[in-house]
Structures are given as structure tokens and as C-alpha cells.
Amino acid sequence: PAFMIGAIRSLLTIAPAFILHEIAHKIMAKRYGCWAEFRADPSGLRFGVIFSAITGWVFMAPGAVMVLGRTTVSQFGRIALAGPVTNIVLWSIGAIAVLAGYVTGLESNITNALLETWIWGNGVLALFNMIPLGPLDGKKIKTWSDTVFWIWLTIAAGTVYANIKILGPILGPMT
């Protein structure tokens, strides 16, 4: 039962974080006249399912949006930035909901559990994708602009810091 509850919780919180992150890439790519399509990676999905079953933590790389077309370095960087920015916006919505629930007293165990996974999922996804290595967004953003990269890396790291120091204590111990 605990695994099923965790799976449902992740489906409601982590799946939107990932899906909207990828849709943001596609929307920006289309804006620049590029072809963009999600490509599944079964090995990343298998790894994620096994990792989650063993550790209880959700970490999946089920695929990514592939972009084809003529873009400038700036456009490609902006396409990459759309994903982490989306996660930071989603994290902000969750953070506001946590604070609103705390201030008004309209919080519940179920809501807190969902918000906890929401803020952690979006914060970590934004920060992870800002790593400037391999196929991750951070590398494309840094290639485009060091300044933009460092600003958004700092913001993404700030979401995780806020989860630990501010929002985590409000929500209570991880469930």
C-alpha cells in the first residue's frame, strides 16, 4: 500500500512537473519555427522504476523533447531555459500554496504531502536540469549566456534551499 500511495502521489505531482517542463521546450522551439517532438527513452524509464522501487525516491529520465531546425545559439539557449523556468514557476505556485495554508490554517496531511512532493519535484528538476553537462538544459543555457545561466542556476538552487530552510519546517517531517 505504501508503494501505491507513493506512486499515486508522484503521478499527481512529479508527472506534471516533467510533462510541463517538456511541453515548455516544445512551445519555445515551435515559436522559433523548429520541429519539436518528445522521444521516449525506455532505458531511462526502466532505471527510474527500479530506482524508485529500491529507494522510494522518484528519479526518472523517460525521455526528452528533440528539436530540429535552424536556431541561433541564443534561441537554442532560450528553448533550453523554458524547461527549468517552468519548474520554477510551478515551484512558486506550490510555495505560495504552502505559505497560504500555513497562514490561514487551511492545511491538511494530504494537501501537505502533495505540496511537499510538488515543491521538491519542481525544485530538484529545475536544479538538476541546470547542471551544465551532457544533454541537460544547463549546458545549452551556459553556451548561450554565462550570465543567464548563473542567474537561473542561483534561482533553482534557491528553490531547494527554501524547501529545506523555510517550506520543509512548515510542512513538517518528510512523509
Locate predicted features.
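Hydrophobic transmembrane alpha-helices and their immediate loop junctions
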Residues: 1-175
